[in-house]
Each structure stands twice: as C-alpha cells, then as structure tokens.
Amino acid sequence: MEEPGATPQPYLGLVLEELRRVVAALPESMRPDENPYGFPSELVVCAAVIGFFVVLLFLWRSFRSVRSRLYVGREQKLGATLSGLIEEKCKLLEKFSLIQKEYEGYEVESSLEDASFEKAAAEEARSLEATCEKLNRSNSELEDEILCLEKDLKEEKSKHSQQDELMADISKSIQSLEDESKSLKSQIAEAKIICKTFKMSEERRAIAIKDALNENSQLQTSHKQLFQQEAEVWKGEVSELNKQKITFEDSKVHAEQVLNDKENHIKTLTGHLPMMKDQAAVLEEDTTDDDNLELEVNSQWENGANLDDPLKGALKKLIHAAKLNVSLKSLEGERNHIIIQLSEVDKTKEELTEHIKNLQTQQASLQSENIYFESENQKLQQKLKIMTEFYQENEMKLYRKLTVEENYRIEEEEKLSRVEEKISRATEGLETYRKLAKDLEEELERTVHFYQKQVISYEKRGHDNWLAARTAERNLSDLRKENAHNKQKLTETELKFELLEKDPNALDVSNTAFGREHSPCSPSPLGRPSSETRAFPSPQTLLEDPLRLSPVLPGGGGRGPSSPGNPLDHQITNERGEPSYDRLIDPHRAPSDTGSLSSPVEQDRRMMFPPPGQSYPDSTLPPQREDRFYSNSERLSGPAEPRSFKMTSLDKMDRSMPSEMESSRNDAKDDLGNLNVPDSSLPAENEATGPGLIPPPLAPISGPLFPVDTRGPFMRRGPPFPPPPPGTMFGASRGYFPPRDFPGPPHAPFAMRNIYPPRGLPPYLHPRPGFYPNPTF
C-alpha cells in the first residue's frame, strides 16, 4: 500500500517536463488565443470529450454490475428449486417405505385375525354344542336346576353379545380394510401423478439449463467483445494523450527559452533606466508623437537599424520595455494556466491508471468466475445425468412395487370374499343358535309358569287348610266356653234348688249377693260385674279388647315398630293364662258363636271335620280368614310363616309422608278402636277406590251398627255380613288375589292382616322391558 503514495512525485515531474516540451514545440500559429473565461477552447473540448467517455464508461459499468447481480439471483433461485425438488423426492421415498411397512404389517395382522377367527368360531361351536347337550340333559331335572339354567342362559346371552361384538368388530375391520385399499389406490394414483410431474419438471429443468448455458456463452462472447472495444478505445485515448503530452512539452520548452530571453532583455533595460531618468523632461514634450514613434520604433526594430539619436532610442526602449512587461504578465498567466492544466492532466492520468488497474482486476475476477461457472455447469450436467438415471431406476422400482401391490390387492380381495363367506356361515349358525336359545327360553318360561301355578295351588290349599284349622280351633274354644258357662248355670240352678228346698223365702234375696257369697265359682274368673236384672249370667265374650281395624293391602307387608300404646305389641293373656290374640275381630271372618242364638245342630255341623287327606265339602266350608300380621315380628302367623317373600319394604317410602296424614290416621284408629265395632265398610271402600288411594279418616260412630244379643250383661255382635258363598277346593279365598300372568312384576304375597290403612303408593315398580323376575318360591 506504500507504492501508490511514493510513485506520483517522479511521475508528475516527467509529465510536467513532457508538457513543457509539447508547449515549446508548438508553432506560434497553433498557440491558442485567449477566451473570455481564461481557458483555451481545445482544452475545454478535450475535457468535455473525456467527461462524456467517463460517463459512458460509468453507465456501462453500472449496467454490467446490475446484470451480474441478476444472473447470480437467478442461479440462486434455480439452486433453491433443485434443493426443494430433491427434498420432495426424499419425502416421497420415505412415505413409500412407510406405506410398504404398513401394508406388510396389515398382511400379518389379517392372517393372524383369520386364524384367531377360525379358532374362536370352532371353540364357540363346541361351547354351543356343549351347552345344547347340557340343556337337553337338564330338561329332565328342571325342578331342581332352574337356577342353573338361568345362569347358563345368562352365560349364553353374554356369549351372544360377545359374538355380536365380534361380528361388529369384523365388519369394522372389513370396512377399515376397504378404506385402506381405497387409500392405497388413491396413493398409487397420486404417485403416478407425482412421477409424471417429476418427468415434466425434469424436462423443464433441462430446457432451463440449456437456456442458461446459451445465455452464459452469449454473455461471455459479449463480454469479450466489449472488453476488446474498451481496450481499443482506451488505446486511442492514451495515444492522443501522449501526443498532447509531447506538444505540451515542446510548448513548455519554447516558453522557457522565451522567458530566458526576456529576462536578459529586462536586465539590460533595468541597466539603461537610470540613464533614461535624466531624459524624462525631454520625453514629456514629445508625448504627442508617441504613435508615430512607436511605428518608427517597430520598423527600426524589425530592420535592425541603429538609432543615431539617443533620445529616440531611449524612448523606443522605454516603449519596448512597457510592452515586454505586458507580455511577461501574459506569459506568467499562461504559465500558471499551463501548470494547472498539467496538474489536471496528471490527475486524469492517475485516474486512468487506477481505472486500468481496476479493469484488469475485474477481468481477472470475471475470468475466475467464468471458470467457476463452467465447473459448476459441468457439475450440474453430471448431476442431471445422475438424477435422470436415479429417477428412471425409481420409476422401475415403483412400477414393480405397483405390480406387486396389485397382486396383493387381488389376493386380499379373494381373502375378503372368503372371510365374507365365513361370516355369512357364522351368521347363519348364530341365527340357528339364537332360535334354539329362544326355544329353550320359551320352554323354561313354560316350565316356570307350570311350577309357579303348582306352587300357588299348593299354597292356596295350605292356606285354606290353615284357615279351616283356625276356625276349628275357634269353634273348640267357643264350645269349651259354652260348656263352662252351662256348667256354671247348672251349679247356680242346683244351688237355687237347694236353697228353695231349705228355705222357700230365699227368693227375695238378690242374685248378686247370693252368688258372690255362696257360689263356688265366684268371684268370676273374668272379673265381670253380675247383672241384677238377669237371672242367668252370660259368659265372657270375645270383644273385651278394643277393636282395631285391619284392612288388607294387596302387596302385603306392614310397618316397622308400632306406637307404644298398640295392644298388639305382645300377646294378651287372660286370668286363665290362655292367649287372647284369637279374640281380635277380623272384618272378613265369621263372628264367634258363643253368644249366638244358633241351634245345636248348626254347632254340630261346625264341629264336623273332614277325615285327613280330604277337603271340606262345599256346604260345610268354613269362612276363610286372612293371615294375621304382628308389627313387632313382621312375620306371618300360621303355616305360611316359614316362607320368605321378596317384598320391597315401604317403610322408607312411608317416612316421607307428612305428619298430618299419620296423625289423622292414628286418630281414626283410636276412634275405631274405642267403638268395639268391626267396620266392614272400610274394606269395601278400599276395594272400590283401589290400592293406590289413601282413605280419609272416619268419623266416630256413636252407636252400634249391627244387631246385638241382649241376653247377657255385654252386647254380643251378630255377624256383620251374610256367610260367604261356598267355595271349591282351588277357589280363591276372600283375602286372596290371583297372581298376574308371567312375565311381569313379581307376584304379590298372600293377604295379611295389618293394623294400618292402605298406603297411597303402588306396591311394585314398573317392570323393565326384557327383565324376567326371579320366582318367589
């Protein structure tokens, strides 16, 4: 970097010397005249021409730089497109490999599914055959194996559901396979389209590369031509500048010689000046003739004649000195102007040298770039050849894979047709097995209905027998009480006869005092006050305890713990130690015959019992009564006691009832209990209104509603209803409700006595569709 700063000084000296020589060598006619601005016209024209060429060169250089940048950008775009196409090709190859792997995995899965499906079908067929054999064997033992059959049915239903699920899964898998085959077809079509697009893009790329090569060659030729033209132009300019330099040097040498001569002449004139000062006065007088003298001086100067007169010679010398001063001043101005021009020429020369150096460096860089682009062009051609070969190989591979996939697809379609045939066979087998299962279910339902009917008939017989036994027990107790009463009457009459025999005036004595003091049976074991108006005391009745209403609910069941004042919380015993629970009055039972006016023949009929193993005759069928229910134990009394019924307790539902309803019910119960009267209108109203309605509380009754027997000190109620019509052996009793048809909700238990009125809720929930309840036996 130090050389450019060191070279300008000697170079400038040489340029100045050459300019001086050029100026000295110029003739006087070639020397430029002065212009109004102080510059010669030739220099101005040269500077304008040089400026014009400089502007043209600058414009051409800018055009070349812009053109080169556009070419580089275009090459970059082409490289980016090539890289994008290569990446797309790699992605497509990866997708194709993934699809091939998925297809192979799918083939393995389909083969495994076919094998597993065949095994499952065989196992299911075996299991179904085993279940059919088991069901055929178990038909003979349906009475003891109904629950087992239900379990088997549940298992078969689960198996059928599993089979349905398998069928759904198989159908889904078939649909998925079809979708996958469609997707593969679409992917194959897309791959073909992509291959076609690749071919088109390759052709376009080859055409673009050819165009780029042609453009490159054209640019190289144009660059060479332009470089040659510029070199020729610069050579001409340099030759012209050298010529100008020589002329300037010649003019400079001539000017230096003239300056030296004039300096010598000035020195001589300065020597003559003091001599001429003395003659100044004489010169003032001859000022008028200056013009003529000047002409004469010039003529004499040219001719070289010597002046004889010293005054005239001095004047001429003075005039010549003035002219020399003027010419010296003009020469100095020209000298300064030439020096300025020389400096400008040196500057332009330096600029030209620098520009030449820059052009040389640019030429070297362009040559290197040309070499680089040629190498890249060769590389791209090689890559194009390799890519074309690679694409051809890929096309062949893809075509082979497509043929293989088409073969696989044909095989899969054949397999799918086979699987569909197997599925159709399996569906037919499933339909047959379903029909068999339905037939078996119908047979089971029939057997269950048959055995339920038998159980219901047996329960009804047991219930009727139990009612007959209870009525017989009541009749026995009534007869025993009547016997005791008759014995008491006999003892009283015997005592009266004895007293009459002893003292006939003893009739005036009151029967009460006599009985209390002298009767062996007094005081009465029942603690009854004797009647003074009656001659014969009446026996104890069965209505000493307060009456409690016991309507029957269709669904059975009762409440939990009752109130502490309930007389049914414990068994009431009389003074003899006999239980008094039989004295409770049922509205559906016949009243006791203790105080009735029936004849002894009817009593004998009531005492008649059929032999064991036979039923009651229709004419002598005793009135049927419902089972009693005690609130503490919540159990049935009688033969139905050990049986367990699956009943939904209504205690939880009853807890949500308002307290006002329960208080009104309790008031109604207390009112009815204090009347000692069985109200038969309540069951009729309950039957009329239905089991879902709550009866309103009854008003207190002031007097007896039924005929009474006024023979004893206590009123004896007659039968509230006429006797029931005679029933058959399997006829429904008054408190019995027949079971509903199966299927449906579970059967209602047998009617039971209950101390509470019916509830305002349904006894059972609505049955669910397809739900078969368990039998209640």
From Swiss-Prot:
Please state where this protein is localized. Answer: Membrane
Q: Region (Disordered) spans which residues? A: 510-688, 721-742
Keywords associated with the record:
Coiled coil, Membrane, Transmembrane, Transmembrane helix
Q: In which tissues is it expressed?
A: Expressed in testis, placenta and skin. Expressed at lower level in mammary gland and stomach.
Give the Polar residues compositional bias ranges. 530-541
Major localization listed first in the record, in broad terms: membrane
User: Key word Secreted present in the record?
Assistant: no
- Where is this chain compositionally biased, Basic and acidic residues type? 572-591, 649-672
Is Ribonucleoprotein one of the keywords? Answer: no
User: Superkingdom of this entry's organism?
Assistant: Eukaryota
Membrane-crossing segments per the record: 39-59
The coiled-coil segments of this chain are: 118-269, 339-494
Q: Please give the family membership noted in the entry.
A: Belongs to the cTAGE family.
- Protein purpose: Tumor-associated antigen.
The protein's name: cTAGE family member 4
Phylogenetic classification of the source organism: Eukaryota, Metazoa, Chordata, Craniata, Vertebrata
